[in-house]
């Protein structure tokens, strides 16, 4: 095993990944990826992306790309608190004339939106730029996986060392036990020595159990710390004649490199002059899961003969697909953000939280004991006032506009199937609840 974990830059060099670590814009790409912060579009980045001319013209052309593709961005001044320590902003301030610094503005994008801009570049060297950025992103993912494997090996080694130490302790304890037996035979061993040895044995067993729990927990943590990546794609494709009929194919692939093959398959079956093309691409974590969600929501709009085709006006289809995929991505991103907190709680020695049961009425459990069925009656704790008030709210929502009578006995009989409660207390709470209703007047009937 390595003495220390290899840093990212050494890792990239050793793996011969096609990334120039000495380029003047490498740090401007790497810093936002590593810190998960916004990207500042500097003069160096604009030149790297293929924009020429003065800064004002470069910035204007890049903004046009963002606006045309509905990519969110923000314009900031040099004294924005969020970017005072950002290396790119520090460099830009140093390179800008002090007389112009107060008027100059910079475009900033979130990491995901910067990637979308890279993927939609239309400059002369756009394809080279995309390959470079994707290589850098893949290198980061590969390095994260390397870190997980390194930590797992370290955990296994520490566990092996700890097991050796525990085995040595147990061996010494066994020797002490033999010596104790010998002393007992000679009649010179005292009760205090016996008690001390027994306490030491219990202590060692507890330490062994605690160490084992900790090692298993650590091993599990190094496996679960890896975040889910969002590198797969959902696409919408069509042809001119199909689009004129509101007919679109919605599918997915594992990565951008698989798109060309899909298009070749579709055009192999299309009529000459009416070739298929992609009209929209969306990044997702798992395209198959995303396809399943799309089918579940708008499956009724699929062509009965060709299940792969959805029949829907493009603007509406695009809005629905974007909504489904964005919500899926938000769920994955939220879980990624929670991973550290989840892992930290696993590593804590705090007592786990055991949730309270919802108070319900009595119920029976039948067990087989000595070949016979034995019924056991279990009574749950009483429902709280807040729980019953919530059920009262649900009940009045089921009444029609013209209904205003509430039958106490019928309502309480229904609730007793779910909860265990005192009917006298519930009657008082029900009257309080009805009196608090301002939108509608209800009549309470005892029976």
Curated annotation (Swiss-Prot):
Q: Write out the entry's keywords from A to Z.
A: Coiled coil
InterPro entries in the cross-refs: MSV199_dom, Phage_T5_Orf172_DNA-bd
**Where in this chain does the entry annotate a coiled-coil region?**
188-221
Tree of life domain: Viruses
UniProt KW Nucleotidyltransferase keyword:
no
Q: Where are the transmembrane segments?
A: none
Give one Pfam family, short name only. Answer: MSV199
Protein known as:
Putative MSV199 domain-containing protein 420R
The organism is: Invertebrate iridescent virus 6
């Amino acid at each position: 095993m390595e003495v220390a974990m290899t840093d990212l830059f050494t890792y990239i060099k050793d793996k011969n990944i096609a990334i120039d670590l000495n380029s003047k814009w490498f740090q401007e790409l790497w810093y936002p990826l590593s810190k998960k912060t916004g990207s500042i579009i500097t003069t160096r980045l604009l030149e790297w992306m293929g924009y020429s001319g003065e800064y004002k013209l470069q910035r204007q052309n890049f903004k046009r790309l963002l606006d045309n593709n509905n990519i969110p961005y923000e314009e900031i001044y040099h004294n924005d608190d969020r970017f005072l320590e950002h290396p790119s902003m520090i460099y830009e301030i140093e390179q800008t004339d002090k007389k112009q610094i107060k008027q100059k503005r910079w475009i900033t994008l979130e990491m995901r939106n910067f990637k979308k801009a890279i993927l939609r570049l239309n400059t002369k060297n756009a394809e080279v730029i995309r390959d470079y950025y994707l290589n850098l992103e893949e290198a980061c993912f590969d390095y994260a996986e390397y870190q997980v494997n390194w930590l797992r090996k370290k955990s296994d080694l520490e566990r092996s060392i700890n097991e050796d130490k525990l085995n040595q302790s147990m061996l010494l304890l066994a020797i002490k036990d033999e010596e104790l037996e010998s002393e007992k035979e000679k009649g010179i061993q005292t009760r205090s020595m016996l008690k001390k040895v027994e306490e030491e044995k219990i202590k060692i067993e507890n330490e062994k159990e605690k160490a084992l729990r900790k090692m298993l927990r650590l091993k599990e943590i190094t496996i679960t710390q890896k975040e889910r990546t969002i590198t797969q794609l959902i696409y919408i494709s069509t042809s001119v004649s199909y689009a004129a009929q509101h007919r679109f194919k919605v599918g997915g692939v594992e990565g951008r490199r698989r798109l060309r093959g899909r298009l070749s398959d579709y055009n192999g079956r299309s009529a000459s002059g009416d070739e298929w093309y992609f009209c929209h691409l969306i990044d997702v974590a798992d395209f198959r899961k995303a396809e399943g969600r799309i089918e579940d929501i708008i499956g009724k709009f699929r062509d009965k003969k060709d299940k792969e085709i959805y029949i829907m006006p493009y603007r509406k289809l695009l809005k629905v697909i974007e909504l489904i995929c964005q919500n899926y991505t938000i769920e994955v991103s939220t879980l990624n953000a929670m991973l550290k907190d989840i892992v930290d709680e696993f590593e804590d020695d705090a007592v786990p939280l055991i949730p309270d049961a919802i108070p319900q009425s009595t119920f029976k459990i039948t067990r087989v004991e000595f070949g016979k069925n034995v019924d056991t009656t279990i009574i749950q704790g009483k429902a709280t006032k807040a729980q019953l008030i919530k059920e009262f709210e649900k009940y009045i929502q089921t009444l029609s506009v013209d209904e205003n009578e509430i039958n106490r006995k019928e309502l309480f009989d229904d609730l007793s199937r779910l909860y265990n409660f005192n009917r006298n207390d519930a009657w008082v709470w029900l009257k309080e609840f009805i009196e608090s209703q301002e939108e509608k007047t209800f009549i309470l009937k005892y029976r």
